[in-house]
């Protein structure tokens, strides 16, 4: 989904829960409380069927939210949703503050270095610590994982679909070693 999309990807339906049609929705960002703030979601099943669904009830748990969705009455109904991607409507969210971004808007941006050289495309965001990490991939290159912090990402231009990256020093050192072969014979 692009920055102009009416939806932002929140997570996915991880599993059916119980016998009465509840589902467990796991957010891509474990710290996200977004589902608490909306009344509806957009669901895309593995079969490609898309539809709006209303939230009737929500119970947060440490790993996921247990949700009752309108029209999902049985375990079979819930199991049919397992693996479905879950999106929220952009219009239902508070806009991000100046200099802040919805993580979903960063996925798909072209990543370049300070000189404009292509590094790849932001394919994923890992939220494993205090700072999210951008996963940048390009054909024929190693995956680049960069902390989403001003020091490493000085510019985000959603209109141009571009992000400027200052890779961490360890990435630059690894790249130089790979270019020269990186073996002890190259250390002279």
UniProtKB/Swiss-Prot annotation:
Keywords: Chaperone, Cytoplasm, Ribosome biogenesis, rRNA processing. Disulfide bonds: none annotated. InterPro entries: PRC_barrel-like_sf, PRC_RimM, RimM, RimM_N, RimM_N_sf, Transl_B-barrel_sf. GO terms for cellular component: cytoplasm; ribosome. An accessory protein needed during the final step in the assembly of 30S ribosomal subunit, possibly for assembly of the head region. Essential for efficient processing of 16S rRNA. May be needed both before and after RbfA during the maturation of 16S rRNA. It has affinity for free ribosomal 30S subunits but not for 70S ribosomes. Belongs to the RimM family. This is Ribosome maturation factor RimM.
């Amino acid at each position: 989904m692009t920055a102009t999309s009416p939806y932002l990807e929140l997570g996915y339906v991880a599993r059916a829960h119980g016998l009465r049609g509840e589902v467990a929705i796991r957010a891509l960002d474990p710290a996200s409380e977004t589902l608490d703030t909306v009344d509806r979601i957009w669901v895309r099943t593995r079969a490609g069927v898309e539809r709006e669904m209303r939230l009737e009830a929500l119970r947060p748990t440490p790993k996921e939210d247990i949700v009752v969705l309108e029209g999902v009455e049985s375990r079979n109904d819930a199991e049919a949703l397992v693996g479905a991607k879950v999106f929220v409507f952009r219009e239902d969210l508070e806009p991000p503050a100046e200099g802040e971004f919805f993580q979903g808007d960063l996925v798909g941006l072209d990543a370049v270095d300070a000189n404009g050289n292509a590094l790849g495309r932001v394919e994923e965001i890992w939220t494993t610590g205090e700072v999210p990490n951008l996963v940048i991939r390009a054909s024929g290159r190693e995956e680049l994982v960069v902390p989403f912090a001003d020091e490493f990402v000085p510019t985000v231009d959603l209109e141009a679909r571009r992000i400027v990256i200052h890779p961490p020093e360890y990435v630059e050192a690894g790249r130089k070693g790979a270019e020269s072969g990186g073996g002890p014979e190259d250390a002279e």
